[in-house]
């Protein structure tokens, strides 16, 4: 499943939409 291209701040993968992971070094989902 593709990650929607929406900038979302995160600390953990669970903060992101389905299909996304948290890029912890920039604190955004991707």
UniProtKB/Swiss-Prot annotation:
CDD domains per record: PlantTI
Principal cellular location given in the protein's record: secreted
Keywords: Disulfide bond, Knottin, Protease inhibitor, Secreted, Serine protease inhibitor
Record's subcellular location: Secreted
Highest taxon in the source lineage: Eukaryota
A cellular component term, taken from the record's GO annotations: extracellular region
Gene Ontology MF terms: serine-type endopeptidase inhibitor activity
Site (Reactive bond): 5-6
Disulfide feature: 3-20, 10-22, 16-29
Listed PROSITE patterns: SQUASH_INHIBITOR
Database matches in Pfam families: Squash
Function, as annotated: Inhibits trypsin.
Written domain comment of the UniProt record: The presence of a 'disulfide through disulfide knot' structurally defines this protein as a knottin.
Family: Belongs to the protease inhibitor I7 (squash-type serine protease inhibitor) family.
Protein name per UniProt: Trypsin inhibitor 4
């Amino acid at each position: 499943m593709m990650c929607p291209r929406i900038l979302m701040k995160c600390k953990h993968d669970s903060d992101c939409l389905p299909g996304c992971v948290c890029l912890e070094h920039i604190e955004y989902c991707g």
